[in-house]
Design a protein with these regions (language model features):
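A cross-family phosphate/adenosyl-ligand binding-site feature
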Residues: 1-118, 124-213, 217-244
Length: 244
């Protein structure tokens, strides 16, 4: 599905960094060329060797690393990239990119890229809701970056709220939407209904069916991946189906 596609994963210093190893493995199984960039702080959460083992490519951390064939690496990689995902994106790196600061391999490469760029913030709720962080994210969106809203849940600091990075399966859908499917439904609005329906007989009894809703969810997801603005209306569903 992703053969001949170069996916750049830019990993910053966040506890959620370990989840990107799973995403890298998923992308590799889809035959993508997966390139991983890390900030120095990110290496405190996960070892670069993990990514090198999963992707078969050198994990780039140091701009001045001389242990590989010479090239202006951040420019060479930027030219090859089909999509860049910065995940988890710390408040620090979001601020750097939004204000044009490029002082390491990750930020210089992101600055040099002309492909689609996706940012997935991950941080404490108070940090995420800080007006400065929100202003930086809004600025990135004006510059054409796609921002994935963080999930709401229990955070590593012990708080519960917005700031949790979405699961790798969700991040994968954003990448696939950008590079793996034709955009023949761009500009279309698709409404899909899914799940078991009920027809009342009287205030107590009703007629229903055993629909799981999985087919409707699959159709909605396929439309979304092909560029449509998709909304799904769900009736009672006998099993849990996730839609991204």
């Amino acid at each position: 599905m992703l053969k001949n596609k170069t996916i750049v994963l830019a990993v910053t210093g966040s506890i959620a960094a370990y989840k990107i190893a799973n995403l890298a493995s998923m992308l590799k199984k889809l035959h993508a060329d997966v390139q991983v960039l890390m900030t120095q702080n990110a290496t405190n959460f996960i070892n670069p060797i993990t990514f090198e083992t999963l992707t078969g490519n050198k994990c780039l951390v140091d701009t001045f690393d001389r242990n590989f064939q010479y090239s202006v690496e951040h420019v060479a990689l930027a030219k090859r990239a089909d999509v860049v995902l910065v995940a988890p994106a710390s408040a620090n790196v979001i601020g750097k990119i939004a204000n044009g600061l490029a002082d390491d391999m990750l930020t210089t490469t992101v600055m040099a890229c002309r492909c689609h760029k996706i940012i997935s913030p991950a941080m404490n709720t108070q940090m995420f809701e800080n007006p400065i962080v929100q202003d930086n994210l809004a600025k990135l969106q004006r510059f054409g970056y796609e921002v994935i809203q963080p999930a709401h849940g229990y955070l590593a600091c012990g708080d519960t709220g917005a700031g949790k990075m979405p699961e790798p399966e969700t991040l994968l859908q954003y990448i696939l939407k950008e590079v793996a499917f034709p955009k023949d439904l761009t500009g279309k609005r698709v409404l899909v209904t899914a799940g078991a329906t009920r027809e009342s007989i009287d205030p107590v009894r009703f007629i229903t069916n055993h629909s799981s809703g999985k087919m409707g969810v699959a159709i909605a997801k396929a439309a979304m991946l092909r560029g449509a603005h998709t909304e799904d209306v769900r009736a009672s569903m006998w099993s849990t189906c996730a839609m991204t």
